[in-house]
């Protein structure tokens, strides 16, 4: 469908009743948002590293349909399409939410913390937690070699009974748990997510 084909039925329907007019306005705004998102997506696919948004492309889009570009473009830029890009920029600079900031500050630096598009912190700890959770201070790193030797050649199922990952879990911000004895799930140290 062409933009000119959409305008003619909308003008006729707007004269019928005010309730249809608000519905049609909502429909028109949603169509313009879809077109805007589509044009932005193609622009970002062609130039993925471009930090600027294509401002000049939006103005002709509203003018081609015969609508005032200021009302349509302003409504889109204020509410919908540009918001995810602004959030992505702010999340790359650091967390703006106080809870995210506290979570990153709680990290001791053994694992890198990244923030995804929704703002959740994801610790990059590798395939297992023992090296990040157990060695939280330089003094604990000497005992880390002992833990690694037990991991490589465990003699019995109780080889991890003397290792307590829970004591350093809050200090490092590590999200993983190592339970020494999986049969005892009702201990007070066990956290349920």
Curated annotation (Swiss-Prot):
Region (Disordered): 1-193
Disulfide bond entries: none
Compositionally biased spans, kind Basic and acidic residues: 1-15, 22-58, 76-86, 98-109, 142-155, 163-173
Biased composition (Polar residues): 180-193
Domain of life: Eukaryota
Similarity comment: Belongs to the DNA mismatch repair MutL/HexB family.
Stated name of the protein: Protein PMS2CL
